[in-house]
């Protein structure tokens, strides 16, 4: 029996992905990325200074850094989400740390030199998978930002060492499914977020049983789905970047 989801996708089918690069003019990397109804603006900015703790830790080495910030705009969800001003909620803090950790795994910081890259991910519309879409879009924005300073970098030592993308997987009505939207996520018996390189290596796996525990077999099935989905996302990133794809 073929399991058909509420939006008519197959169990192993991603939502439709759309990307608009150079969406804004101020940041050297700027990407509007959509997966179904979920929409995130990812920008990458480059500063020629380092955080004080980073500069103090490596006074003799010109080693760069990457950090990330994540926020959901008030109108991105219903009911309205209160705007984060002085203090971020725990969820946003956790997500931006995940985005930062993931994207740092792609960068050779010695090749970058004494620069700080900031990835800003602002959710314009939330329908599930905002953190994973932020990573996938954030990588595209990162590539465009690095391309903007190519003339200041050594051609012998690439700054970006691997591609990464991320996707959610879960179990809905007893069936492992790929790329959950909000309806599915709210009903999921198991919820995983998987970050992988374009070569198929795992960078981070976050998983939770929402009710009863799940078996190793179900875990393997979900990781297989994630591997398939991320391979598709990596191809999409390559097509979106075109000549700016950092790997020849």
Q: Can you name each region flagged by the protein language model?
A:
Residues 1-27, 31-34:
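Short, Gly/Pro- and small/polar-rich lid/capping loops
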Residues 84-88, 121-130:
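A short glycine/serine-rich beta->alpha loop
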Residues 89-94, 128-136:
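Short, conserved micro-motifs enriched in small and acidic residues
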Residues 18-20, 32-34, 41-43, 67, ...:
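Structured core elements
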Residues 29-33, 130-137, 141:
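Conserved phosphate/anionic-ligand binding catalytic regions in large, soluble enzymes, centered on
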Residues 23, 28-112, 200-202, 206-219, ...:
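Glycine-rich, flexible beta-strand/loop modules in the N-terminal catalytic cores of phosphate-handling
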Residues 111-114, 129-133, 143-147, 153-248:
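A structural signal for small-residue-enriched, beta-sheet-centric alpha/beta enzyme cores
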Residues 17-20, 26-29, 48-52, 104-106, ...:
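Glycine-rich, charged/polar anion/phosphate-binding loops
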């Amino acid at each position: 029996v073929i399991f058909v989801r509420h939006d008519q996708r197959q169990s192993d089918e991603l939502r439709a992905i759309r990307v608009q690069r150079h969406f804004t003019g101020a940041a050297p990397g700027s990407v509007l990325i959509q997966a179904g109804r979920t929409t995130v603006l990812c920008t990458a900015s480059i500063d020629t200074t380092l955080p004080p703790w980073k500069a103090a830790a490596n006074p003799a080495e010109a080693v760069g850094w990457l950090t990330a910030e994540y926020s959901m705009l008030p109108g991105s969800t219903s009911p309205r989400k209160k705007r984060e001003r002085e203090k971020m909620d725990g969820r946003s803090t956790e997500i931006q740390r995940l985005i930062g950790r993931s994207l740092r795994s792609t960068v050779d910081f010695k090749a970058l030199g004494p620069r700080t890259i900031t990835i800003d991910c602002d959710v314009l519309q939330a329908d599930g998978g905002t953190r994973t879409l932020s990573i996938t879009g954030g990588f595209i924005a990162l590539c465009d930002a690095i391309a903007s300073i190519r003339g200041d970098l050594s051609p012998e030592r690439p700054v970006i060492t691997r591609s990464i993308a991320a996707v959610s997987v879960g179990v809905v009505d007893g069936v492992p499914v790929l790329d959950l939207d909000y309806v599915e996520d709210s009903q999921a018996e198991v919820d995983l977020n998987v970050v992988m390189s374009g070569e198929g290596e795992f960078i981070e796996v976050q998983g939770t049983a929402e009710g009863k525990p799940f078996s190793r077999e179900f875990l393997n099935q979900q990781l297989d789905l994630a591997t398939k989905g991320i391979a598709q996302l990596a191809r999409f990133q390559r097509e979106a970047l075109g000549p700016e794809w950092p790997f020849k």
